[in-house]
Regions:
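Short, flexible helix-loop junctions that flank or precede catalytic/ligand sites
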Residues: 1-219
Length: 219
């Protein structure tokens, strides 16, 4: 079952419900009605208030797979956002299993890309490249051609980060660790940020430095 605002794509085999806050049918009310039907999977289009998140997390603790969205800058800050909404840390620790954050970036046109001579090792170091990486890196940009209508970009691609809430992170949430401490635990256990993926795409020539800055260095 899904609760959406609005229902943008109709999918066969899925019960989709349109949220209508004007008549009092909110995400919270939709969730309550879903639980009476005991579905295996629930999608809540967006978590906007404490009541909705509490029901969603409790649903996750009673054998339902629950998906939803939340407005934050990255995956780790979703935990802080839930805490700031007044959600008890024990509920977050027990119910949350995975967080994914994503941005959409324009892909450099492969038909007209050239090396961007303005990108210096010092500039690459400033965004987290290691000196030995910066020294040999070749960063590309689109020069514009008929295949990309002169824009230098052709197509789009996702830039992602996926944070698995493992036992160490669950313990950190229960211990009321600060977000910086939770970030450190995640990185130690192999978490790669959107910036890390963006740097990989810079090195592969799929992402221009200008697009990296636009998508990943502005909130």
């Amino acid at each position: 079952l899904t609760a959406e605002d609005p229902v943008e794509y109709e999918m066969e085999g899925i019960g989709q419900v349109q949220v209508k806050e004007g008549i009092g049918y909110t995400f919270e009310e939709a969730l309550r009605s879903f639980l009476r039907q005991d579905p295996e999977v629930i999608l809540v289009g967006e978590i906007r208030d404490k009541a909705t998140v509490d029901i969603a997390l409790k649903a996750a603790l009673t054998g339902h797979l629950v998906f939803s969205t939340l407005h934050t800058n990255d995956a780790p800050s979703s935990i802080t956002r839930l805490l700031n909404m007044g959600t008890p840390n024990y509920l977050i620790s027990a119910a949350l299993t995975l967080i994914m954050a994503q941005r959409l970036a324009r892909k450099t046109c492969l038909d007209c890309r050239v090396i961007d001579e303005n990108i210096t090792p010092k500039l690459l170091n400033s965004i987290g490249f290691l000196p030995e990486q910066s020294a040999r890196a070749k960063i590309y940009k689109g020069s514009g051609c008929e295949n990309c209508s002169g824009s230098g970009y052709k197509g789009r691609m996702g830039i992602y980060e996926i944070l698995e809430i493992d036992n160490e992170l669950k313990a950190g949430v229960l211990s009321n660790l600060q977000q910086t401490e939770l970030n450190a635990i995640a990185k130690k256990n192999g978490f790669r940020t959107m910036q890390d993926m963006g740097q990989d795409l810079l090195l592969s020539g799929d992402l221009s430095f200008a697009e990296y800055e636009r998508v990943l260095q502005s909130n």
